[in-house]
Regions:
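Structured segments of extracytoplasmic/periplasmic soluble domains
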Residues: 82, 156, 197-200, 232-235, ...
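A general sequence property marking short-to-moderate contiguous segments
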Residues: 1-18, 281-301
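Substrate-binding/access-modulating region of protease and related hydrolase catalytic domains
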Residues: 217-299, 314-342, 349-373
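Subtilisin-like serine protease catalytic core
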Residues: 115-227, 244, 248, 278, ...
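Stable alpha-helical elements in mature extracytoplasmic
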Residues: 75, 190, 194, 229-232, ...
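Autoinhibitory N-terminal propeptides
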Residues: 1-67, 74-116, 126, 139, ...
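Conserved short loop/turn motifs at secondary-structure junctions
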Residues: 63-70, 253-259
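Non-catalytic, beta-strand-enriched accessory regions in extracellular/secretory proteins
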Residues: 299-312
Length: 373
């Protein structure tokens, strides 16, 4: 395996399509229509030379030396050998991280304290919400004269951007009945609720100017890709620089892939953007409830750790990630309710296919055994 290519990308490319499509983190970024992968690239220096060589690839430049590239797997392997390339990783699937009403977010308490003590209201600051859209006619996002507080809006689903003047013109036509539909409509309600909490007139930053990015489609999938978030962050910061205003960017999405230690290109991009301009990037965490999708423990050399995994009926697939330090050795064994065993060790690391009841996920209690040392 090429050390400059993320192992999940290499594993996903080597996995059969019917299996890969069952795992969102493996399938994210692959376009079946042209057999190309969308990848995130961290670079050192200019890519002018590389772009002149890989003419069939599509390059999108982001801030801080990051690029999003669409190309074939063969070109990815060749690209990884170029001296300008530091690392390549694939997009991951992200999901909503906020399902709370304004009262549950303690906004009412914050507003009461703001009134009592004369707290900050966000005046002169931009609040950017990267989410599922916005209802631009909502009074929460209008000023006292009925004009929009949104300075710019980018709808990734259509590729169209709107200025505040264009939004006000659309609103006037909508009120007069000249138009029946509004751009960037939030059909899920998630983005609207997030924006109300963050920068609505009854929200926290009630006097802030607003930037909205409606995230694009993911080929009919129920998730958003990290690359869509990265493009949104890039857009918001560039606009803040153009307006000469500080910006607070809200991202109420999250995922379960990775070690969550800040070592992925996506996480490093967020960190680097924070030091590029006067900006703060806020990302939601938690929201797992009783899902209990994460677990951590400590292993002692020579000991065996047994953990149970409860898998419900009709689960089409299950993705298990075990993260450890590179210098530690561990032998991992999965025991199905049927008694079948799958042993994973350093010797057979990589892509391993194992049939259990003709590839069906067996519901019940699975046992994960880890031998350390």
């Amino acid at each position: 395996m090429n050390p400059r290519i993320e192992n999940l990308l290499q594993i996903s490319a080597d996995t059969s399509e019917d299996i890969r499509q069952q795992v969102p983190d493996m399938d994210a970024g692959f376009d079946d229509s042209d057999r190309k992968w969308e990848i995130i690239v961290k670079t050192a220096g200019s890519l002018d030379r590389i772009r002149s060589i890989y003419t069939n690839a599509e390059f999108t430049q982001l801030l801080c030396g990051y690029w999003i590239v669409r190309t074939t797997i063969d070109s990815i392997e060749a690209l990884a050998t170029e001296p300008e390339i530091i690392f390549i990783e694939k997009p991951k699937a992200l999901y909503f991280e906020l399902y709370a009403a304004k009262s549950e977010a303690c906004v009412n308490v914050a507003k009461a304290e703001e009134t009592q003590y004369g707290g900050v209201t966000g005046k002169g600051v931009l609040v950017a919400v990267i989410d599922s859209g916005i209802d631009i006619e909502n009074g929460e996002f209008l000023d006292d004269s009925g004009k929009t507080r949104i300075k710019t809006l980018w709808d990734q689903t259509t590729g169209i951007t709107y200025s505040d003047k264009e939004i006000n013109s659309i609103l006037e036509d909508y009120r007069n009945g000249a138009v029946k539909t509004l751009p960037a409509r939030d059909v899920t309600g998630h983005g609207n609720e997030v924006a109300v909490i963050a920068c609505g007139r009854s929200g926290v930053a009630s006097d802030a100017d607003i930037i909205i990015v409606k995230l694009g489609n993911s080929g009919g999938n129920a998730y958003i890709r990290t690359t869509q978030i990265m493009k949104g962050v890039d857009y918001c910061i560039r606009k803040a620089i153009e307006y000469s205003q500080p910006v607070a960017v809200n991202i109420s999405y999250g995922g379960t892939y990775g070690n969550h230690e800040g070592s992925s290109i996506f996480e490093m991009f967020i960190d680097d953007c924070c030091s590029t301009y006067r900006c703060s990037i806020c990302i939601g965490v938690g929201n797992e409830g009783e899902g209990r999708t994460h677990y951590s423990g400590q292993l002692v050399s020579g000991n065996v750790l047994d953990e149970e995994l409860a898998i419900g009926d009709y689960e089409p697939q299950i993705s298990i990630q075990i993260w450890k330090r590179a210098m530690d050795n561990a032998r991992i064994e999965l025991i199905a309710p049927t008694g079948e065993r799958l042993v994973i060790s350093e010797r057979n690391a990589g892509v391993v296919h194992h049939n259990i009841k003709n590839m069906r996920i067996v519901s019940g209690i699975w046992t994960g055994t880890i031998l350390y040392g």
